[in-house]
Structures are given as structure tokens and as C-alpha cells.
UniProtKB/Swiss-Prot annotation:
Name of protein: Aspartic protease inhibitor 2
SMART domains named in the record: STI (SM00452)
Induction: Not induced by abscisic acid, jasmonic acid and wounding.
Source species of the chain: Solanum tuberosum (Potato)
Signal peptide residues on this chain, from the entry's feature table: 1-23
Length: 220
């Protein structure tokens, strides 16, 4: 009887050793879950809706405030308003309505999207509602925001919304192009911040290296 038990132990020993070796050296690494994207919120704490319209308003007040609006670019001979501006103060006209067009699904932080002025317009000017970034402006030594973009066009019409550490959001321009085509896209994700420059007394949205425009989104 003892001899049989001894032989049985000898037979089971390789299995135990193999099992121990497999357990210690061949652990299966399960993929870690990616963090869920955070939705962009409006001034009431509601998630932005692609089917709704919003005003882009500045966090600042008085001369530091002012809504974003569609206006005529100085010296432009185009048939339609084609510039993206910000009013000089939060006291005065309200901004032009916009809607956000994500690549798919909802509107989330740090996700590519298009921005469109959501206004009634004549057929001739329909294409002058989509935001884009223009060519390098020699006078300002930067690239100005204008309209005439194309939904889904990566080179000039893609933007992102990113959350500030304390309150509000920044807008980023994020093309999918070689770096030399966007010398201002310097962060790790190849994006540039949107701020303002003064053009003929108006605040024109443009790409900036510092002092980006801090904004909120107000549903209308």
C-alpha cells in the first residue's frame, strides 16, 4: 500500500511543478480600461448636444468679456461675412449661435469636431458658416480664424474643446497635417490654442502661443 502511494506521488510531482511554474511565469495581463471621455458642459451643467445651438461667451466681464460672432473680415471682397470675432465687451450684442459637430456620438473634451455658425443664410453663403483656420497672415504672423471650412476636413477645420484646470474651456485648432503647415501647433497633440488679435479695432480669433481665450457655452 505504501509503495502505491509513493508511486502516485511521483506521478503527480511533475504536474504540481508545471502548474507552479505556469502560475508564476505566465500570468495573463488583462487589458486595462481606458478612462471614459468627459462630456463638455454648458453654463447650466448640461452636456453639449450636437442638435442644440450655443453662444460662445468669455469668462471675463466688461472689457475682458464679449461673445464670439460672425463678421465681415476687413478688406475682404468675399460675398458673405467670413471672419470669426469676439465683441469688445460683454455689454452689448449677443454672439452668433454656433453648433458643434463631432466626428461621432456626443461632444467630449479633447475630441475632434467642427464648429458651425448656426444661422439662417442665403444659399450663396451656406459654405461660409463652417469655421476654419486661414493661411499664415504676414502682418500678424499668425493664422486667423475664418469661415468657409468643410465638415470632416482635417487640414483646416478640426478643433477641440479642452477643460481648464479651474473653470471654463479653451478652444484648440488640431489639424492632421505635417508640422511645417502649422508652426503654432506645438503641444504634444499637435494643436494650437485659439486666442485673439486686434484687427482694425476688432478682436479677431487667431492662433496664439499664450493668453488663449477662456470660454463657456450658453445654450440658446
Amino acid at each position: 500500500m505504501m509503495k502505491c502511494l509513493f508511486l502516485l506521488c511521483l506521478c503527480l510531482l511533475p504536474i504540481v511543478v508545471f502548474s507552479s511554474t505556469f502560475t508564476s511565469q505566465n500570468l495573463i495581463d488583462l487589458p486595462s480600461e481606458s478612462p471614459l471621455p468627459k462630456p463638455v458642459l454648458d453654463t447650466n451643467g448640461k452636456e453639449l448636444n450636437p442638435n442644440s445651438s450655443y453662444r460662445i461667451i468669455s469668462i471675463g466681464r466688461g472689457a475682458l468679456g464679449g461673445d464670439v460672432y460672425l463678421g465681415k473680415s476687413p478688406n475682404s471682397d468675399g460675398p458673405c461675412p467670413d471672419g470669426v470675432f469676439r465683441y469688445n465687451s460683454d455689454v452689448g450684442p449677443s454672439g452668433t449661435f454656433v453648433r458643434f459637430i463631432p466626428l461621432s456620438g456626443g461632444i467630449f473634451e479633447d475630441q475632434l469636431l467642427n464648429i458651425q455658425f448656426n444661422i439662417a443664410t442665403v444659399k450663396l453663403c451656406v459654405s461660409y458658416t463652417i469655421w476654419k483656420v486661414g493661411n499664415l497672415n504676414a502682418y500678424f504672423r499668425t493664422m486667423l480664424l475664418e469661415t468657409g471650412g468643410t465638415i470632416g476636413q482635417a487640414d483646416s477645420s478640426y478643433f477641440k474643446i479642452v477643460k481648464l484646470s479651474n473653470f471654463g474651456y479653451n478652444l484648440l485648432y488640431c489639424p492632421i497635417t505635417p508640422p511645417f503647415l502649422c508652426p503654432f501647433c506645438r503641444d504634444d497633440n499637435f494643436c494650437a490654442k485659439v486666442g485673439v488679435v486686434i484687427q482694425n479695432g476688432k478682436r479677431r480669433l487667431a492662433l496664439v502661443n499664450e493668453n488663449p481665450l477662456d470660454v463657456l457655452f450658453q445654450e440658446v
